[in-house]
Amino acid sequence: MSERKEQGIYAAFDMGGTFIKASLMNDSGKTVKGTFGIFPACSDQAAERILNRITEILLHMLADCPDGALKGIGFSFPGPFDYENGISYIKGLNKYDALYGINIREEIAGRVDERAKAFRKACSFKILFENDASLFALGECCKNKELQNTSVLCLTLGTGVGSAFLREGRLLKEDKDIPRNGWIYCCSYKGRRVEDYLSRRGVIELARERHISIREPAALYGMAVQGNETARRIWGEFGKQAGEILSPFMERFGGKDLVLGGQIAKAAVFFLDELEKTAGNRYRVHVAAGQEDESVFQGIYRLLAQEG
């Protein structure tokens, strides 16, 4: 008997602007063999086309599943988005604009239900939505037992800075000791937003101050790998600055662990020492290992399982 016939099943979708990554997960949070796929997103097309595309992918993955096996569908969706109610407010980004104001939960449930009726199958499952930073954080806690019974701030450092606060493996959104929704990007630091520092443009600006012109942090990382001392000092400055920005959040929250992910975290070998020096012994710093996609899918599973 196949894996998907033995256990309950969760469907996970990572809704990128260019591609949709999707997979089935079993009751243990493992990817069901042969179900992971990468599909064109059609994100610049009409709402009907996008919604039908999601439904087609889901039904294709579920083709061999028995009636009632599907326990939930989870989506990692970019914002702005009403994650609780499943409504997209993306506009002007040339991706998923056509879904603006649409209740995606209701639309997907209706399409799957209609198809199920045609095959006389019963449907009873939940559909949940969350942003990629929160799901990445949940996934990291799921993978690392050390993080499951503590207070964690998890960051994704890239074009912007995504953040999520967790306590004992659960996401916090409304808590007196954290920013609203757990989002630090819009908080103030030295008269500017945190995202102006802990992001692609923050690294580029630090490099420019040292008279190095780069278009991407990866270029500065490459220079540091090759032994360029100025590049290494810039990364050190980034780490020190990150520690100064993040330590007040950690202190107020009572955070014990800081997890770093995203493209910029790949350069952590050059900035981790300075970050840890600034942090002192107040909290531990971890750099996420493995593929970020894997953590997002693990996070979707964890979100659905917690809501079970």
For each predicted feature, which ranges?
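Conserved glycine-rich phosphate/nucleotide-binding loop
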Residues: 2, 16, 281-308
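Short glycine-rich, Thr/Ser-proximal phosphate-binding strand/loop in the N-terminal lobe
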Residues: 5-56, 60, 68, 87-92, ...
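Short glycine-aspartate micro-motif
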Residues: 10-14, 70-74, 152-156, 259, ...
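Conserved A3 ("GATE") glycine/threonine-rich loop of ANL adenylate-forming enzymes
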Residues: 18-19, 135, 159-162
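Glycine/GP-enriched mid-protein hinge/lid loop-to-helix segment characteristic of carbohydrate kinases
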Residues: 23-25, 34-36, 46-47, 99, ...
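Glycine-rich phosphate-binding loop and adjoining helix at the ATP-binding site
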Residues: 41-48, 52, 69, 81-151, ...
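Adenine-nucleotide phosphate-binding core of ATP-dependent small-molecule kinases
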Residues: 42-66, 192-196, 204-270, 285-296
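Short glycine-rich anion-binding loops that position phosphate/pyrophosphate groups of nucleotides
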Residues: 78-81, 158-162, 264
